[in-house]
Amino acid sequence: MLLPLACLHGRVAQCLTSLLVLAEPFPRPRRGAKARGAAPTSAEPAPAVAKMAAELYPPASPSAATATDIANSNAAGAAESTKVGLCCPPCLAPAPLPPLPAPPLPDNNNPESPNWQSFHPTLRERNALMFNNELMADVHFIVGALGAARRVPAHKYVLAVGSSVFYAMFYGDLAEVKSEIHIPDVEPAAFLVLLKYMYSDEIDLEADTVLATLYAAKKYIVPALAKACVNFLETSLEAKNACVLLSQSRLFEEPELTQRCWEVIDAQAEMALRSEGFCEIDRQTLEIIVTREALNTKEAVVFEAVLNWAEAECKRQGLPVTPHNKRHVLGRALYLVRIPTMTLEEFANGAAQSDILTLEETHNIFLWYTAAKKPLLDFPLTKRKGLAPQRCHRFQSSAYRSNQWRYRGRCDSIQFAVDRRVFIAGLGLYGSSSGKAEYSVKIELKRLGMVLAQNLTKFVSDGSSNTFPVWFEHPVQVEQDTFYTASAVLDGSELSYFGQEGMTEVQCGKVAFQFQCSSDSTNGTGVQGGQIPELIFYA
């Protein structure tokens, strides 16, 4: 019976495919096979063919094998359907094809895999892949102190391109020829941050290592990384770490950071001097702080801070904490404290009982307070100037009317933002418009609903349209470009003045203030009019 032409062409193509896949030809029929009518079968490949197919196509992974099995079963079903539908003779049935191998998954993180460069199309990506990588490394660093050192691979060319120090080290007249270089004065984590930046331009700073990273950036003259470290420190600067950062900024010769530290220390002197960080500074920095004219705190606080530092220094030096040893470690710093500017009560209850002063010094200071003929003292006699508070007034005029404005225990509130860091010391409030009056007041400062500071106190107004200051216990640090909410709740029956012609933006010296209405305000205060006419701040 003749086969249809389409069936014949399909079977010929399948047989050719089978011949191409198989590594050996079909076995020839034995002599006389034709006479007996036997035909060669191709249903099973020869053992050698099966073996070669197994070598060429090793077993795939389970997931790939599952997919291959499904494909083979579909192919087998299709072949069976073709065989039944076309009634092809068994002699033309193709041999089963070996399973196709699963495509390899790209390994983007393994530079040792073939053609890894293809997965990183940009120069920056390829360079970043070489960071902390042994591949092609031609130098190694032993970084850190003995016992905590770490071996770091690197590439001379990359380091020399990013740092003049490394260039001189590897390609200068006195180039280093050793394959391992010891760096005991740099922390391993900081050194890796340095190298990561040099390989990829990525800066990965953390609070625990930023100072060590700044040291490394300074040592190897990488100014962009050093600048990023300084910016990070300025952002995280607050009273509890300002003294430590002041010490470090002087060490690294960073005048901008030094100035930012002084702004915090001056405005929040009491909090800064009572912080744990103050006890960690060196003696030279201690002397500089104690001589500071702008410290905005009482001298009794300065004296207490100096004693705390002396106790910590005795422990650092392994000395017993005694009055004698405290005087020894303080040296001339003790005589920079302006003890005579304390009140008599502060001196009698504090410095006079500290045992760090000699009996003669204590006697002479008491005489200086009380006697008409005052003895000579070795301590400064002039009081510190401190900081002069600034006031941001947001109304162009004030007024009063017979039926308003009245404090009724409701909240007057306004939101504000600044374009640089300031320290809010208090609020200026309007008082009675009908004579002298006393008010109970609660002032509050919030950020994103969180209370940063509050104070419950009283103030007396004299009947004028002047504003009356109400202070927080400590100045509150306010960061730029963030809205804060200032609120006041006053309890009083007298009519009061109120502001009008309010401004949305006010420039106070170097600081620009921006105001907007607050949803907390329930007594009518807003941008255009109402209470809280002033913000009192240091900058």
From Swiss-Prot:
PROSITE patterns: BTB. It is found in: Cytoplasm. Residues 137-207 form the BTB domain. Residues 1-23 form the signal peptide. The keyword Cytoplasm applies. InterPro entries: BACK, BTB/POZ_dom, BTB_POZ_BTBD6, PHR, PHR_sf, SKP1/BTB/POZ_sf. One of its GO terms (cellular component) is cytoplasm. Keywords: Cytoplasm, Signal. It holds the Pfam family BACK. The keyword Metal-binding does not apply. Adapter protein for the cul3 E3 ubiquitin-protein ligase complex. Involved in late neuronal development and muscle formation. This is BTB/POZ domain-containing protein 6.
